A protein has these predicted regions:
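Conserved substrate/cofactor phosphate-moiety recognition/catalytic segment
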Residues: 28-71
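Glycine-rich phosphate-binding loop used to anchor ATP phosphates in small-molecule kinases
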Residues: 61-112, 127
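Pre-Walker A (Motif I) flank of P-loop NTPase domains
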Residues: 9-12, 78
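Hydrophobic anchor at the beta1->P-loop junction of P-loop NTPases
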Residues: 15
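A glycine- and Lys/Arg-enriched "phosphate-lid" helix/loop adjacent to the NTP-binding pocket
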Residues: 98-168, 181
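P-loop (Walker A) phosphate-binding loop of NTP-binding proteins
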Residues: 18
Length: 187
């Protein structure tokens, strides 16, 4: 299908990384600054709705809920789609908490195009409890970060690692998204 001149191609940005690294905050900051559409984290809705911790049997429902939210947002074709998370987080949490994950998560992840992953480091910011978080130890969050980075590199996903204090994270993320938005589309 030929692209009409002057019509921007949707760019999809994913915030990834361990808990308490600023993903939701940064997604909201990006949305406020650049506009577009932001998709939240389905697992938070799931836990709030069911009022209990998750188990391995919940992972397919959580992943399908996340996909439904993402796909509904994609269907609207915003100039910029900001995802607070995606299936990689569901996969890694399932592995971390339950030692297993539904194999179809890999296929679904690789079937979708993501223009940029902003991978947030656990370094330089404090872990904050919020009733759903469970990795207060920096070593655990570092392992989650490394698992995310390893997957992205293995699957040749575009990634920018975001580090530093909150102001530095915001500045780095804004610069990466700005660069993405001015780059020519190749899709």
């Amino acid at each position: 299908m030929a692209r009409r001149p002057g019509v921007a191609h949707m760019k999809v940005v994913v915030l990834a990384g361990p808990e308490s690294s600023g993903k939701s905050w940064l997604a909201a900051e990006l949305h406020a600054h650049f506009g577009g559409l932001m998709v939240g984290e389905y697992v938070r809705y799931f836990i709030d709705h069911h009022q209990r911790d998750t188990c391995l049997a919940d992972i397919p429902d959580i992943a399908l809920g996340q996909l439904a939210w993402e796909d509904a947002a994609r269907a609207t074709q915003p100039r910029l789609l900001i995802l607070d998370t995606h299936l990689l987080t569901n996969k890694l949490w399932s592995q971390t908490l339950f030692g297993d994950y539904p194999a179809w998560l890999d296929d679904e992840l690789l079937a979708r195009h993501y223009d940029l992953h902003l991978l947030l480091s656990p370094e330089d910011v404090e872990w904050t409890a919020d009733g759903q978080r469970c990795q207060p130890e920096l070593a655990d969050r570092r392992a989650f970060f490394q698992g995310s980075l390893d997957w992205m590199q293995q699957h040749h996903q575009p990634v920018v690692v975001i580090r530093g204090d909150w102001a530095a994270r915001r500045s780095q993320a804004f610069a990466a998204v700005e660069q993405l938005l001015v780059a020519p589309s190749h899709a």
